[in-house]
């Protein structure tokens, strides 16, 4: 068997007989490929073990007769500009999504890849875009609680249990369980964190094309030095949170709205599955 054929074989699922044959092959190229193959298997086994641990909360509820468990997380509580995005995700009981983790621990490219896989595999997904107006009206904590309750009530498949990243929430006809660092401990919450983060990043990238002076594509609405300088020079857009300092103290008139805005800073929006800027 040629080395190229061995490589192709080991990319698949070789039989035990084929592996024995390759182990007896003294060619260094074959042995290197075998070593790489076993390392890959070990890495895959470790990832499956890690993912299984991330399903511990969900499996405990399923073992007690619960039919559906949702995970809930948000993106955008801290920025000076842009909406708050909240996502709820129900994963299949037998789900396996390699690399799933807290969105903050992942690169943008990895989040985008996982976003697509979550969309493809999830039982149900709901996204709630909480408006800047409601953030300013209710304060960010209350707006988050309110938005999380709403995203659960709008889920097309209703869960009996909702696992929520650190936030105490009350929603109709379900048990809501806050979990500190839940996005690193629960697969469902981690999936929700990725959906929320990718969705919000795409919104901010869209807003960057409409308000290019503020660097939204890069700062995602956080108060970087360049962002603060732009506010001082050009004023605050209607996407800036007037209840957040230092914008609150600046008392600036809003920049004129763009004619082709895709989202509203005054109205909450609900989306099932995905939002593409």
Task: Label the predicted regions.
Residues 1-70, 77-277:
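RNase H-like, Mg2+-dependent phosphodiesterase core
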């Amino acid at each position: 068997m040629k080395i190229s054929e061995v490589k192709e074989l080991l990319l698949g699922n070789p039989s035990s007989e084929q592996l024995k044959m390759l182990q007896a092959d003294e060619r260094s190229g074959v042995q290197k490929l075998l070593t790489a193959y076993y390392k890959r298997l070990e890495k895959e086994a470790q990832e499956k073990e890690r993912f299984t641990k991330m399903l511990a909360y969900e499996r405990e509820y399923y073992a007690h007769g619960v039919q559906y468990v949702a995970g809930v997380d948000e993106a955008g509580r801290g920025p000076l500009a842009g909406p708050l995005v909240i996502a709820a995700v129900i994963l299949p009981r037998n789900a396996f999504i390699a690399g799933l983790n807290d969105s903050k621990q992942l690169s943008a490219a990895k989040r985008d890849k996982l976003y697509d896989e979550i969309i493809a595999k999830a039982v149900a997904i709901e996204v709630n875009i909480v408006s800047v107006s409601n953030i300013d009206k209710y304060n960010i904590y209350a707006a988050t609680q309110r938005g999380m309750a709403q995203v659960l009530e709008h889920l097309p498949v209703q869960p009996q249990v909702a696992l929520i990243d650190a936030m105490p929430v009350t929603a109709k006809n379900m048990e809501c369980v806050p979990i500190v660092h839940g996005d690193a401990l629960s697969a469902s919450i981690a999936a929700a964190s990725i959906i929320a983060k990718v969705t919000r990043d795409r919104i901010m990238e869209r807003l960057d094309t409409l308000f290019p002076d503020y660097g939204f594509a890069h700062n995602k609405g956080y108060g970087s030095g360049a962002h603060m300088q732009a506010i001082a020079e050009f004023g605050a857009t209607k996407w800036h949170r007037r209840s957040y300092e230092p914008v609150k103290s600046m008392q600036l008139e809003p920049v004129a709205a763009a004619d082709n805005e895709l989202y509203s800073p005054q109205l909450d929006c609900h989306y099932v599955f995905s939002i593409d800027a």
